[in-house]
Amino acid sequence: MPVEAPRPARHLEVERKFDVIESTVSPSFEGIAAVVRVEQSPTQQLDAVYFDTPSHDLARNQITLRRRTGGADAGWHLKLPAGPDKRTEMRAPLSASGDAVPAELLDVVLAIVRDQPVQPVARISTHRESQILYGAGGDALAEFCNDDVTAWSAGAFHAAGAADNGPAEQQWREWELELVTTDGTADTKLLDRLANRLLDAGAAPAGHGSKLARVLGATSPGELPNGPQPPADPVHRAVSEQVEQLLLWDRAVRADAYDAVHQMRVTTRKIRSLLTDSQESFGLKESAWVIDELRELANVLGVARDAEVLGDRYQRELDALAPELVRGRVRERLVDGARRRYQTGLRRSLIALRSQRYFRLLDALDALVSERAHATSGEESAPVTIDAAYRRVRKAAKAAKTAGDQAGDHHRDEALHLIRKRAKRLRYTAAATGADNVSQEAKVIQTLLGDHQDSVVSREHLIQQAIAANTAGEDTFTYGLLYQQEADLAERCREQLEAALRKLDKAVRKARD
């Protein structure tokens, strides 16, 4: 997989599907104020081959990947969930490679398929009659499709060990109602009005989220027979939810979405914190490989994250200064330089996200969340509580107070950073175990000291850039101005810490009552 995989264009699809019987008459859209004209489109014959892993990992994540011929949009289509009635569609053209999935589409879902084979799992043939609904301005508003569907499931769908008796043919009729979106927005009220006409005509909301889901036997979007159930244990459930978020942010990072690297790193650290504070429950040891791998992944993502945060920070601070206070090449060095470092960090991150090492980490996380809470000596593990995590926060706070009284700035900053890391672990554990007030107060401390740590990193970077600017004979006035602003911010954060710690203590004592 190339480091710089091309990014396919994205299109927001807003549609609803309806089940109808053979005798149901197509609806009329007369009387709907927004619709001034309905135009019949030529009949289409669409043939699509759907691809997935042998265990249907894409379908379980409500994702479809197909190669379609016929119609105006022949090509490869990848559809991702984007909310109720919405999916993000990405396309690639047909090529001479036949059934080889385009690399740019496969890369989008690489965290789901990993190094498994992606192969045909179904073929769907659709005879489509469609109508385009136009508004007063002459623009298309929506498309109504009357589909007669014939489908065949591939032998890969059969359960492990089951005999393969060949593909089974299925036939049904369905309606689709798709809005024409503009700049990623859609008139959902219009969709409701149009959908009511279909219901009045005798249609029923589809019992499947896609044609493929019906072929594979799903009863609702993303649900396949014998799919995993959410863990009952709250900490296991929290880890499971964060692993799902990790896969979502993985796709956002590959698309270079704003703040995606930062959020993926946050999610990685959440998982690591929850596992570290619940090792007995998960059957892990202190030096567990999965915890070490999560730390390493966060470190790799941190290069791009730090550059993105610093670049945004300097952009805001420089924009807030009077023009006469911004001297020399400070914007080029601080903002443009951060953007270059971000691109370097992003390339490193993408290399990591396409590696076997990353795939094995994801496999290990899947195994952890799918297993029952680890039991010791035939008994259930002790429930995870906030007590141990809070004791670590108090210990770090005491050490920081000592460092503030006796040590220099560096040791003080390190001690405050330790409070932040431990408050973060407490926050995640408290949220997972239902101690919401504790989680909120821990978040306040995490945010406060996060701002402090960003100030520490920023001041170190400002010194380095000021030295380079001075060596080049440039004006360094603005670097000193920004440095003092950062120092003032750090001082304000330290002044607010004691009160925040008291509020946390109060929340913990209340949670214990």
UniProtKB/Swiss-Prot annotation:
It comes from the Bacteria. Residues 11-219 form the CYTH domain. Residues 228-506 form the CHAD domain. Transmembrane segments: none annotated. This is Uncharacterized protein MT2285.
